[in-house]
């Protein structure tokens, strides 16, 4: 059951589909405890200088695990950053049984399999005036702030998006990293070529990272431009704890949109430089630190559903151990064995 839940959780989005997480499960006769670590070997340093996006990705996978376990009648009790001297250990999760699972909780777990990162143009989301209040209610306001960018402010976001790309234009490490993570020969991670927009398609999407062009298609030609709503997710400050909780809220938003039949695309390139991030911050009335943006809209009804992006095999992301001998802390042992006592 835990293995299936971890497999489902690992459908979480991550920057360039890098999947920068690692799980260690301690299995005993009475209970199982799961530890979440950030895997620094799977970060994208030329894109994500601070490591913020890797932590956000881990927050999303943590919330996905909570949702998957809830659907299996187990409540996840999460302790975040349980070991201050182990900065790469992000959370410890223990489980307690629950008697009743609602249809909504099961649907949320099912939405994990349905969610895609869709980089093509969207039509306007239907009944947004009804959906937006429900979406806001799903967000813990003490953890993150949700702003919806008005149509007349969108041009400022376009400026921020273009500025981000201009600042990276002559960065060979950034472009080499993009080429590697979008290689058509990578099988278990990265961004598959058919999920990227072609030249013709990205001309109709005003907000998006400039990935390498891998195809010459012209999908959704009936949409002359992108009519999505754009959400900004911000946190009270800019700590690692903020980034982790932001990822959990990002998971909530993406799955709520998916359950409502909407398509989504997470945008982080506008946050990767301080100049473009300042523009985004200005659109949120300077309240908090912008962490991610999300395009939300409707894919045309007859449009092909994007194929699921690949994921690493379970034995690459999950290690199961029997409960260690009495008096020895398993997470300390794990850190010593893997050298994860280094500072962040």
From Swiss-Prot:
Residues 304-344 are annotated as: Disordered. Residues 323-336 have a biased composition (Basic and acidic residues). SUPFAM superfamilies: FMN-dependent nitroreductase-like. GO terms for cellular component: peptidoglycan-based cell wall; plasma membrane. InterPro entries: Nitroreductase-like (IPR000415), Nitroreductase/BluB (IPR050627). Induction: A member of the dormancy regulon. Induced in response to reduced oxygen tension (hypoxia), low levels of nitric oxide (NO) and carbon monoxide (CO). It is hoped that this regulon will give insight into the latent, or dormant phase of infection. It comes from the Bacteria. One of its GO terms (molecular function) is oxidoreductase activity. PANTHER family: NAD(P)H NITROREDUCTASE RV3131-RELATED (PTHR23026:SF123), NADPH NITROREDUCTASE (PTHR23026). This is Uncharacterized protein Rv3127. It comes from Mycobacterium tuberculosis (strain ATCC 25618 / H37Rv).
């Amino acid at each position: 059951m835990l293995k299936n839940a971890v497999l489902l959780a690992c459908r979480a989005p991550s920057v360039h589909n890098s999947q920068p997480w690692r799980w260690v499960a301690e299995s005993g006769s009475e209970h199982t405890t799961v530890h979440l670590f950030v895997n620094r070997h799977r970060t994208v340093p030329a894109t994500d200088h601070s490591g913020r996006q890797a932590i956000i990705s881990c927050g999303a996978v943590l919330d996905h695990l909570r949702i998957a376990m809830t659907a299996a009648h187990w409540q996840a009790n999460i302790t975040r950053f349980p070991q201050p001297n182990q900065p790469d250990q992000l959370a410890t999760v223990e489980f307690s049984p629950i008697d009743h699972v609602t249809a909504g909780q099961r649907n949320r777990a099912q939405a994990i399999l349905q969610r895609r990162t869709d980089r093509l143009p969207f039509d306007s989301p239907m009944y947004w005036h009804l959906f937006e209040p429900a979406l806001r209610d799903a967000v813990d306001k003490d953890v993150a702030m949700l702003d919806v960018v008005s149509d007349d402010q969108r041009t400022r976001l376009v400026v921020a998006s273009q500025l981000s790309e201009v600042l990276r234009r002559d960065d060979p490490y950034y472009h080499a990293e993009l080429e590697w993570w979008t290689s058509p020969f990578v099988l278990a991670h990265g961004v598959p070529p058919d999920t990227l927009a072609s030249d013709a398609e990205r001309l109709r999407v005003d907000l998006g990272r400039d990935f390498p062009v891998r195809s010459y298609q012209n999908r959704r030609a009936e949409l002359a431009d992108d009519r999505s709503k754009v959400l900004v997710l911000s946190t009270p400050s800019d700590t690692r704890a903020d980034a982790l909780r932001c990822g959990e809220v990002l998971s909530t938003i993406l799955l709520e949109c998916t359950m409502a039949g909407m398509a989504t695309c997470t945008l982080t390139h506008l946050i990767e430089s301080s100049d473009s991030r300042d523009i985004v911050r200005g659109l949120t009335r300077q309240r908090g630190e912008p962490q991610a943006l999300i395009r939300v809209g409707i894919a045309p009804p007859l449009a092909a559903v994007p194929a699921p992006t690949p994921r690493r095999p379970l034995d690459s992301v999950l290690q199961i151990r029997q409960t260690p001998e009495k008096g020895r802390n398993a997470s300390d042992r794990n850190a010593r064995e893997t050298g994860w006592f280094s500072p962040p």
